[in-house]
């Protein structure tokens, strides 16, 4: 009985968490994600905002070439460029062993999953979508990212309310 109990303990998987992406897909990730490839240029800034820059193991051509990004995060020059936004360098992506791959395109998600990696779709076209993507990215990153995300969203909502209050009563001409 003791041997059976010990065997069961060793058979348990490492701690995991379930993250739900923008389409409602549930993805099982390690509880403590350490390596993230962010293959959507618009989301790389969110990773920085949430304090996850040190977890980046892959980025996009447009981010690597962006002078602003290099100014804010000089180490981006050392992060491998794994996509031009259309195609993924799958073999190189695999070599960097990401715990999670953030991306926006369904076709890329399929490619990542076929390679045996954990893909998490993020995407937004409006403020509600932005807030959802910030929360998803924070959940993937873990650590203090969820707290940072909620503070950012609170500030964003406050700014939106401020602008709406200033525009209230204005008429289209």
Please place each PLM-identified region on the residue numbering.
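N-terminal export leaders
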Residues: 1-2, 140
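Bacterial Sec-dependent signal peptides at the C-terminal "C-region" and cleavage site
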Residues: 12-16
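Extracytoplasmic substrate-binding proteins
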Residues: 17-19, 26, 109-173
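Core beta-strand elements of the Rossmann-like FAD/NAD(P) dinucleotide-binding domain
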Residues: 28-30
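Residues that mark the start of a beta-strand
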Residues: 33-37, 55, 118, 173
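A short, structured surface patch at a secondary-structure boundary
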Residues: 37-96, 100, 105
């Amino acid at each position: 009985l003791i041997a059976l109990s010990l065997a069961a303990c060793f058979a348990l998987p490492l701690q995991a968490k379930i993250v739900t992406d923008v389409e409602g897909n549930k993805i099982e990730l390690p509880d403590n994600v350490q390596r993230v490839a962010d293959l959507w240029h618009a989301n790389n800034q969110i990773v920085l905002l949430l304090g996850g820059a040190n977890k980046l193991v892959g980025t996009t051509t447009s981010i690597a070439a962006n002078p602003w990004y290099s100014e804010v995060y000089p180490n981006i020059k050392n992060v491998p460029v794994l996509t031009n936004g259309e195609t993924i360098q799958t073999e190189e992506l695999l070599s960097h062993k990401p715990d999670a791959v953030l991306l926006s395109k369904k076709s890329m998600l399929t490619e990542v999953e076929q390679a045996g990696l954990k893909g998490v779709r993020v995407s937004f076209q409006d403020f509600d979508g932005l807030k959802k993507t910030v929360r998803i990215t924070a959940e993937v990153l873990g650590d203090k990212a969820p707290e940072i995300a909620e503070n950012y969203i609170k500030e964003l909502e406050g700014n939106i309310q401020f602008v709406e209050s200033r525009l209230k009563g204005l008429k289209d001409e």
